[in-house]
Amino acid sequence: AADEHGQNRQEWHFNEIAPAAAIINDDELALATETALKRFNLVTGEISTITPIEADVPTNRANDSRVHPSGAYWIGTMVKDEGPKDGAVYHYRAGMLSKIIGNAAIPNATCFTPDGKRAYWTDTPTRQILTCETDPATGLPTSAWTLFADVSEHRGYPDGAVVDSEGFVWNARWGGSCVIRYAPDGSIDRIIEVPV
């Protein structure tokens, strides 16, 4: 953890990959790991399992994950070595875990409109960002996934994303050295160059 000046104040080490975290409260995080969704106490360092996620698939790990405005946690999984499409996206809410997307290679760009009525997602190698309607109260999909933006003609691959207060989707491009802002209709609003 870093302070307001960017100085490292505290760090934690885990015995497995933990690529995503969501805030539970001031002292606790929900960690998406290789084997489970886990509760981590920032004060005591205690970690406990909330629910297993693909614990029986040692070749997989969690990847991009995001909290829906309803409080539901969408957790993507992928093959550790970027192999076959054996990953998925799960929905966790109120103690229930359900698979909502299967046959994914690298789940990324999971994000939601502020009102919780729409989700975005990509399987990075496809170079397509998809969208669907979601239930604002539960975070579950309520429609089929449709194409939001075909990014195959642009630089890089779709990676992490977020929706701003105006409903525009900001998408970082792995290997593309840019962040692209998409309008709600899927058209490119602007491209921000980044030095990586």
Annotated model-derived regions:
Residues 1, 24, 29-35, 73-83, ...:
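Conserved beta-strand positions in repeat-built beta-propeller and related beta-rich domains
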Residues 1, 36-38, 87-90, 128-130, ...:
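A short loop-to-beta-strand structural motif that recurs across blades of beta-propeller domains
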